[in-house]
């Protein structure tokens, strides 16, 4: 074998699937699987069997094409170690950097408000239904839970980060186990309600509107955009020098594809299992009660007449505890991102970017007071969580995940090779449909 053949053979071997690629596949998957998944079955099952089947068809393309578009934007910067802010500044100047900072902050902060409402409702329903305790004042419960989390964050942030990383896989495993455990309780209610002669495509409860609103919850639930920039930087540093940018782009696409398949398989199986256990009417009731599907399942098993099996009792309590842990995990993870983003905005606009004018402790205190204060106000007001996701959380995520990369493809020379592709149209349409939810909610 010649020296050239040896080099090619060596590079081919080294460029094949690596352990780090598996690690990142699982990392992207784990980032997306959080408390948002607990609301997806409610919206997906709200309209019955046909809309959720259509969402099943759309799930993988939404997860894969949208995140691949964002990854391509991150890959387009000249500096392999440059994050998304640096890349956007390179393409659009300092103004672009400010815009992306605002987008990141406002993409994450509403999620904290959503989790503030969710954890309050989940705790109160667990307290009243599973523990059979008298009802508590909502404002007090929300304040107590937020102060508890603020205390943990303030005095044990490093420990909390470690705990969060350990909780990812037990949470995913518990979702799969619950999905499997619900199979003995499946019924045909959702199938019996399908009336092909009386299907409405349009209108408030029509299939098209239900799927349209479902797209926003899919964008929210299938979202690992916060980690895409770090993922791309890691892969560029690992592969680009030896194998080139095109190879790195293909590798990133391959990893995103596998993570998306895992994510869709787990979340859709969970959604179908919940829907076959409950019914569209139950899902509507869960939406009205403003609680995640696991809390509703716990109440459902608590209300079973007659002697309950040990399994049903375990599921009743386990579902609520898993929901609480999932929301705590998601809250802490998003809090750290919100704190970092708000610190950056306060530093940029309050202190003109001069880090010497303010201590990190003071900066953290200012940001924490705003974050926890605004979260308490929203948690006390108790807006409908799905409406909040559809009107705020998902549209802002879509602007970052879908529309920003599409705009960059049209304007940035380094992304010109991606112009005119059909998948660009798909990503743009998904982004616009998600943002148009705001208009639907207003009118």
UniProtKB/Swiss-Prot annotation:
Q: Which reaction does it catalyse?
A: L-threonine(in) + H(+)(in) = L-threonine(out) + H(+)(out); L-serine(in) + H(+)(in) = L-serine(out) + H(+)(out)
Q: Which UniProt keywords apply?
A: Amino-acid transport, Cell inner membrane, Cell membrane, Membrane, Symport, Transmembrane, Transmembrane helix, Transport
- Asked if Transport is a keyword of the record, the answer is yes
Q: Name one GO molecular function term.
A: L-serine transmembrane transporter activity
What is the annotated localization of this protein? Cell inner membrane
Q: Name one GO cellular component term.
A: plasma membrane
How does the protein's chain sit in the membrane according to the entry? Multi-pass membrane protein
Where is this protein primarily located? membrane
Transmembrane ranges, per UniProt, are 22-42, 44-64, 97-117, 140-160, 163-183, 207-227, 261-281, 319-339, 366-386, 389-409, 423-443
Q: Which domain of life is it from?
A: Bacteria
Described function: Involved in the import of threonine and serine into the cell, with the concomitant import of a proton (symport system).
Alphabetical list of PANTHER family matching this protein: SERINE TRANSPORTER, THREONINE_SERINE TRANSPORTER TDCC
Protein family per UniProt: Belongs to the amino acid/polyamine transporter 2 family. SdaC/TdcC subfamily.
Which NCBIfam families does the record match to this protein? PRK13629.1 (NF010152), stp (TIGR00814)
User: Entry's HAMAP family?
Assistant: Thr_Ser_transp_TdcC
Q: What is this protein called?
A: Threonine/serine transporter TdcC
